[in-house]
Amino acid sequence: MNTCLEGMAGEPLPYLIQSDGRVTTLMFLCILIVSLAFSKEKKYLLQQAKFLFINRERSSMFDETNVIDVRYFVLLVFHACIITGFCLYSYFTEKVPILFEKIPHMHLLGGLIGIIPIYMLIKWTLYGIVNWTFFQKVKNSAWTTSFFNLFIWLGILLLPLVLLVVYLDISSPTNLYLIGFVVIIAKIALFWKSFSNFFEKIHGAFHLILYFCALEILPDFVLWKGIELVSNNLILKL
């Protein structure tokens, strides 16, 4: 006689990002990268943070604050890509929740993180082509340094916010406002560096607006709408 009894199927628990060991590993890696970089390159990082908001007339080739070990530079850019990907993940989990019901969270998080270095490479290439065509080599070099230093600092400033979002589960409007505030400050700093580096005279304001909108705002808009379009297509197909 068969004595096996079938029980009622349980309801699956919702995905909790703070309980995912892979996410915890990524967060630990980010904290480790920032801690290691500050322990070795603190003087450079703080000096470059100051130069994001003031215009340095000239720099000395013997000034050691102008040089960073390329290993820490690459690690900090990698860290900024991870953190920016987490910010996109936080936004789209709230705005397109149905997508995360169809595709595993870690697959989407990995995809969003992977988009960032590709996007930054494309944007850097566009900046390089335009700057090489219209501006001097010295100014182009200074701009490239400022561009990546700003991206590095964006990742550093967003790290504590991402930790709060992941582990304290801050409500959606609050975390989006905080992240948005940091991003806006970064855009303002980038706008200022564009002006001080390439358009020092006030009559260049119109060209600055065209330059900034075409190479900074438009690519961001295309990235945003591109992710939304892909998300909608995935929802329809899955």
Language model segments and positions:
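Alpha-helical transmembrane segments with an aromatic anchor "belt"
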Residues: 90-167
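Hydrophobic alpha-helical transmembrane segments of multi-pass integral membrane proteins
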Residues: 28-33, 73-91, 118, 122, ...
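Cytosolic juxtamembrane amphipathic/interface segments immediately preceding
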Residues: 6-15, 56-72
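Hydrophobic alpha-helical transmembrane segments and immediately flanking/interface helices
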Residues: 88-113, 175-197
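Juxtamembrane boundary at the C-terminal end of a transmembrane helix
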Residues: 221-238
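Hydrophobic alpha-helical transmembrane segments and adjacent short intramembrane/lumenal linkers
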Residues: 135-223
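Hydrophobic alpha-helical membrane-embedded segments
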Residues: 18-47, 118, 122
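Long, highly hydrophobic alpha-helical transmembrane signal-anchor segments
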Residues: 1-26, 83-99
